[in-house]
């Protein structure tokens, strides 16, 4: 839509807004929220151009970036498709003496931190001739720049210096979260758009993390909460399988829990695992094979798998059970299986599980990334731990994210989750590009969206730290069971298969095992028994 940048006489505000609405036909809604105009039909091309831009920005020599110096900006009219063409042309110019249309801005205008003075966030021009919004942005050194954005002409600035922008990007994310907490949505809306523009100048993990957090903030600001449906559960299962293949976190979770279960079942003739996190049953082939190799022959193995309903009432738990039954037959393990569909673990009752006397059958209860989902419903976690207590298992294995994303204070959980997922995405950067990696990032992005955009019962990604779980389990009548040094050594060997083990770290903490990236623990495996007290 062409606009006159010089004459604003007597244009009706309502008419202008209608014109903008008409102009948005065919535009992607979520990107529009972030301030980008991208037609749905252009999405594939835009994605390809972004990928080309990332490759060129990472490969180009520093000297060749002189035209994109720190003092330089690209003016972005929010038409992302056109802007990408412009950036690609600038980074790969014609051989002729082409001039770059880059505008310099004074150093004082380069902001170190985003904050918006809400008192001057909206100011209508006198006489009604021009509809303007004055926004005052402050930087940490006290320098102030006032920008005036008219409804007739809005020009967004995208700075290209990646390192300095990274600092600004983090400041903008935190400032936006603070504005959301204070319910200052005018400020939050302005900042979330700035985040979108700053994120484009980043490469690698930083850009991906910022984009997911920007989406989550936008959803919270505009109340576009992601839905929770059976289809979402099915999608999450699929994404989790890609995550399992891409990086060692789920493999570590399964391996360490299995080691604790294997040790608890030593010498038992009949064993029963109750899995709170059945999903696709990825954890159990390895345990079954270990049981098959046990001296003196394998025990009778009974598995009870619990999972959420599937779309179209598809019985995926039965299908998983059939696959495991075929494996059991091949490795000569006597196998029994039963699947339970439950909307929530809080619907379970011990009487449903056909428990047998402990002298006949030994039981293990297993939960991987499930218990935190109960924390949004009053009394749910206490009920489930009460059921586990009634089961009287030999061992209760639990794997949870090692981070507190369940603070009642929004800014606290936002800050914690920003650090946590930045580390996780950073650990994925060494993974070769491919479908598994992309789907793993989507898997984590959905978690980010839930932590930031949702509240009440819809917010299920309520991760807590091992120390918080330790207190909760202690109050419910459980005592920690030490996970042996054998598991520690073998887990360390497992990590060597990923990126040569570089960057990953296994730590022992009071009998529990943690897997982290560099100095940051990310997931924790713990084992519990009924307290003798």
Curated annotation (Swiss-Prot):
Residues 453-529 are annotated as: SAW. Residues 240-305 are annotated as: VHIID. Ubiquitously expressed. Expressed in rosette leaves, roots, stems and inflorescences of greenhouse grown. The gene is GAI. A motif (VHYNP motif) lies at residues 73-77. Interacts directly with the GID2/SLY1 component of the SCF(GID2) complex. Interacts (via N-terminus) with GID1A, GID1B and GID1B (via N-terminus). Interacts with the BOI proteins BOI, BRG1, BRG2, BRG3 and NUP58. Interacts with TOPP4. Interacts with TCP14 and TCP15. Interacts with FLZ5. Binds to and coactivates GAF1/IDD2 and ENY/IDD1 at the promoter of GA20OX2 gene. Binds to PDF2 and ATML1. Interacts with the prefoldin alpha subunits PFD3 and PFD5 in the nucleus. PANTHER family: OSJNBA0084A10.13 PROTEIN-RELATED. Belongs to the GRAS family. DELLA subfamily. Induction: Upon seed imbibition, increased GA levels in the epidermis reduce DELLA proteins (e.g. GAI/RGA2, RGA/RGA1/GRS and RGL2/SCL19) abundance and release, in turn, ATML1 and PDF2 which activate LIP1 expression, thus enhancing germination potential. One of its GO terms (biological process) is positive regulation of gibberellic acid mediated signaling pathway. This is DELLA protein GAI. It comes from Arabidopsis thaliana (Mouse-ear cress). Residues 167-221 are annotated as: Leucine repeat I (LRI). Residues 363-450 are annotated as: PFYRE. It is found in: Nucleus. GO terms for cellular component: nucleus. The lineage of its organism: Eukaryota, Viridiplantae, Streptophyta, Embryophyta, Tracheophyta. Residues 1-24 are annotated as: Disordered. A motif (LxCxE motif) lies at residues 174-178. Disruption phenotype: Rga, gai, rgl1, rgl2 and rgl3 pentuple mutant displays constitutive GA responses even in the absence of GA treatment. Transcriptional regulator that acts as a repressor of the gibberellin (GA) signaling pathway. Transcription coactivator of the zinc finger transcription factors GAF1/IDD2 and ENY/IDD1 in regulation of gibberellin homeostasis and signaling. No effect of the BOI proteins on its stability. Probably acts by participating in large multiprotein complexes that repress transcription of GA-inducible genes. Positively regulates XERICO expression. In contrast to RGA, it is less sensitive to GA. Its activity is probably regulated by other phytohormones such as auxin and ethylene. A motif (DELLA motif) lies at residues 28-32. Residues 1-12 have a biased composition (Basic residues). Keywords: Activator, Developmental protein, Gibberellin signaling pathway, Nucleus, Phosphoprotein, Repressor, Transcription, Transcription regulation, Ubl conjugation. Phosphorylated. Gibberellin (GA) induces dephosphorylation of GAI by TOPP4 and subsequent degradation by the proteasomal pathway.
